[in-house]
Amino acid sequence: MGFVDGFSAFLHSSGAVKFGDFELSGGGRSPYYFDLRSVPSHPHQFRGMIRGLLDSVISEVGLDRFDTLASIPTGGLVVASALAIEAVKPLVYARAAAKGHGTGRTVEGIVRYGARALIIDDVATTGGSVIRAAESLRAAGAIVTDAFVVIDRMEGAEGRLGAEGIKLHRLAGALEVARSLHAAGLIPGDVMRQVEGRTR
């Protein structure tokens, strides 16, 4: 069994991927929903996910091609924190908005001018949160050319990020997960076709 097949089966059995009718944070509705916030409650599978992510980062980007990991609270920060430990890389995170107190920074952590930052998030839908993080990081002097997500819902994030000069990488795509689950007999064909109808 390949990584995506095993990971997909775990997402399904743990309830981290659900099929039905869900409202997304952007206001739209979807026949499927990924909630990776529950994955750290399963330490063995969480470790496997982080190791799979590290292997993908090494093969697709290269540890020598970035200086720091940068994440987006809250879902992505848990993933990036574990990945930073495994990769032995510094970690910063970009807020959606500056705090109204303290330093008022939008980026927390040390960002050296000219540092190459690899953005890490849990799930990408349209790419909006990654774009906002990249804007904050670039304003702080970082260079952002790549972003890595655990799950790409495949609903336009890749194209939007590409227009911003950011290549999107993923551990798995929504369609890969659905096809794997269908092949394993865990979801019916009509559910898989609903996913196929939304992804691009």
Swiss-Prot record:
Cofactor or coenzyme needed: Mg(2+)
Keywords: Glycosyltransferase, Magnesium, Pyrimidine biosynthesis, Transferase
Binding site for 5-phospho-alpha-D-ribose 1-diphosphate: R95, K99, H101, D121, D122, V123, A124, T125, T126, G127, G128, S129
EC supergroup of this enzyme: transferase
Alphabetized GO MF terms: magnesium ion binding; orotate phosphoribosyltransferase activity
Statement: the UniProt record of this protein carries the keyword Transcription regulation: no
Residues that bind orotate: T125, R153
Organism superkingdom: Archaea
InterPro entries: OPRT (IPR023031), Or_phspho_trans_dom (IPR004467), PRibTrfase_dom (IPR000836), PRTase-like (IPR029057)
Pathway: Pyrimidine metabolism; UMP biosynthesis via de novo pathway; UMP from orotate: step 1/2
UniProt xrefs under Pfam families: Pribosyltran
GO biological process: 'de novo' UMP biosynthetic process; pyrimidine nucleobase biosynthetic process
The keyword Zinc-finger belongs to this UniProt entry's keyword annotation: no
UniProt-listed Enzyme Commission number(s): 2.4.2.10
Chain's role: Catalyzes the transfer of a ribosyl phosphate group from 5-phosphoribose 1-diphosphate to orotate, leading to the formation of orotidine monophosphate (OMP).
Subunit structure: Homodimer.
HAMAP family tied to this protein: PyrE (MF_01208)
The protein, known as: Orotate phosphoribosyltransferase
Species name: Cenarchaeum symbiosum (strain A)
Recorded name of the encoding gene: pyrE
